[in-house]
């Protein structure tokens, strides 16, 4: 096998459709656009979602729910992630330093997921009931 003998598999490379090249081609003259009408004109296509003057689906259906702006600045950290840290005194800045949360996060909640095997002190961080019990079980503490 040489580089000059390599070729794509049969049917792998599809040639582009050449329109307007005579009636014998099957797509000559009107080029597959039919006769007259908006779709046959240059630039003549409706915008996406246009239903011929009927109220479009995205406007017929009601708006639903909302996106909380607090969720943008809120994140959660698991106990197993805290267990991997070397610090014993933990604040939000420690999480940012270890890339557990992004820099725009202002509120963090620790959730009970995984295990914690050493005592840590959490300050200024919200904690779920289960996570608080797990931290206090290994002689750790949580303070607001």
Swiss-Prot record:
One of its GO terms (cellular component) is cytosolic large ribosomal subunit. GO terms for molecular function: rRNA binding; structural constituent of ribosome. Keywords: Ribonucleoprotein, Ribosomal protein, RNA-binding, rRNA-binding. It holds the Pfam family Ribosomal_L27A. Residues 1-51 are annotated as: Disordered. It comes from the Bacteria. GO terms for biological process: translation. The keyword Plastid does not apply. Residues 21-35 have a biased composition (Gly residues). Part of the 50S ribosomal subunit. Binds to the 23S rRNA. Belongs to the universal ribosomal protein uL15 family. NCBIfam families: rplO_bact. HAMAP family: Ribosomal_uL15. This is Large ribosomal subunit protein uL15. It comes from Vesicomyosocius okutanii subsp. Calyptogena okutanii (strain HA). The gene is rplO.
